[in-house]
Curated annotation (Swiss-Prot):
Positively stimulates PRMT1-induced protein arginine dimethylated arginine methylation. One of its GO terms (molecular function) is protein methyltransferase activity. This is Protein FAM98B. The gene is Fam98b. Homodimer. Component of a tRNA-splicing ligase complex. Interacts with FAM98A. It is found in: Nucleus; Cytoplasm. Residues 305-314 have a biased composition (Basic and acidic residues). One of its GO terms (biological process) is protein methylation. Residues 332-429 have a biased composition (Gly residues).
Length: 429
């Protein structure tokens, strides 16, 4: 522990006097001259010795120390010095001149005696502060927050003021007053509570933690909104016309602004006091709500917005991306796989297999299965003319892909043969 910083001798005497007065010392050394004279005399001064004993006893009552300062007298100065030395060592005194060196030479100077008094008095003052903080939550006085809240409840209910600070007694008076008031009102005047179960201590602690987390979150949001309010009002003063009225704006705005607190006031008591009607959710845009929230400034800031449309039942359908479907027309076109390719190709369809007006191109056969005069291929035969895969022209008759040459002359034999342009089909020689 660091000792107090020492200045001139007069300043040290003033610090000792101020500390002793704050500690409630009522002895003869509250005068500067008497204190200076006793410090010059040292341990031989009875007033100085009595003050050291008083400070030591007060310190020992607040903390557990083995050493103590009890004896004093001119005949037993050495034992008194030993007690003071042991007491200072146990207190971890930072002044080396008071705890080291020859014990008979330690408290012979006025400055050293003032250091001893200043150390003991400041240590006692620190111990008293710590002791007060320790028992602050257990001992309630009239100025505590709970007493103030209970007293505010008593004032609101008209309970006579009492000098007692007994919280249970005040609460019993409040309870009897509330019951008396409820007997004189309608039955459903207060309503049923929203929370119908009794909370245990564990549930109450959990709700307190939840409320603390929510309060921290909403405090952040409230600070953001308040900052936005400050910036908005500040922007109003940028114009030359408003700069002349800065004082008027501040006089009107600042009292209302300082009344806004970033910390929320919602506690667990609000949950216990909530009624069933609080669970009914009313839309903020409903007619009943807007009767009290609507004002002329909404129309001034926004004005009347024109109708922008956008209703689905009024939107016209988009134009078609594909042409309308049409029924397939009957009759051959230019053939199946080919069209008017080659020589005499093209023409309408006959009774051929793969196509009417020529498969790969040809001059439209009149009949035949895979061949005939108009089948798949061209010329005067489909895939076969008079033979298997060809007649006088496979991929072409007199045009198309070839002349008269196909895969062969009269083919490979009899099957599927045709006469080239006649009755085609499954014809034999």
């Amino acid at each position: 522990m660091r000792g107090p910083e020492l200045g001139p001798e007069t300043s040290m005497e003033g610090d000792v006097l101020d500390t002793l007065e704050a500690l409630g010392y009522k002895g003869p050394l509250l005068e500067e001259q008497a204190l200076s004279k006793a410090a010059e005399g040292g341990l031989s001064s009875p007033e100085f010795s009595e003050l050291c004993i008083w400070l030591g006893s007060q310190i020992k009552s607040l903390c557990n120390l083995e050493e103590s300062i009890t004896s004093a007298g001119r005949d037993d100065l050495e034992s008194f010095q030993l007690e003071i030395s042991g007491f200072l060592k146990e207190m971890a005194c930072p002044y080396s001149v008071l705890v080291s060196g020859d014990i008979k030479e330690r408290l012979t100077k006025k400055d050293d005696c003032l250091k001893l008094l200043l150390f003991l008095s400041t240590e006692l003052q620190a111990l008293q502060i710590l002791q007060k903080k320790k028992h602050k939550n257990s001992q309630l006085d009239k100025n505590s927050e709970i007493c103030q809240e209970v007293q505010a409840v008593c004032d609101a209910l008209g309970v006579p003021k009492s000098d007692t600070s007994d919280i249970p007694l005040l609460l019993s008076q409040v309870e009897s007053k509330v019951k008396d008031i409820l007997c004189r009102v309608q039955k459903n005047h207060v309503g049923k509570p929203l929370l119908k179960v009794d909370l245990s201590s564990e549930q109450a602690e959990k709700l307190e933690r939840i409320n603390d987390a929510l309060s921290c979150e909403y405090e952040c949001r409230r600070r953001m909104l308040m900052k936005r309010l400050d910036v908005t009002v500040q922007s109003f003063g940028w114009s030359d016309r408003a700069k002349a009225k800065t004082d008027n704006i501040a006089r009107i705005y600042q009292p209302k602004r300082y009344a806004l607190s970033p910390k929320t006031t919602v506690t667990l008591a609000h949950l216990l006091a909530a009624r069933e009607d609080l669970s009914k959710i009313i839309r903020t845009s409903s007619g009943i709500s807007r009767e009290k929230t609507a004002c002329a400034i909404n129309k001034v800031l926004m004005g009347r917005v024109p109708d922008r449309g956008g209703r689905p039942n009024e939107i016209e359908p988009p134009p078609p991306e594909m042409p309308p479907w049409q029924k397939r027309q009957e009759g051959g076109g230019r053939g199946g796989w080919g069209g008017g390719g080659g020589g005499r190709g093209g023409g309408g369809g006959g009774r051929g297999g793969w196509g009417g007006g020529g498969g790969w191109g040809g001059g439209g056969g009149s009949g035949g299965g895979w061949g005939g005069s108009g089948g798949g291929g061209g010329g005067r035969g489909g895939f076969q003319g008079r033979g298997d895969y060809g007649g006088r022209g496979d991929y072409g008759g007199r045009g198309g892909y070839g002349g008269r040459g196909g895969y062969g002359g009269r083919g490979y034999g009899d099957p599927y043969g045709g006469g080239g342009g006649g009755g085609g089909g499954y014809r034999r020689y």
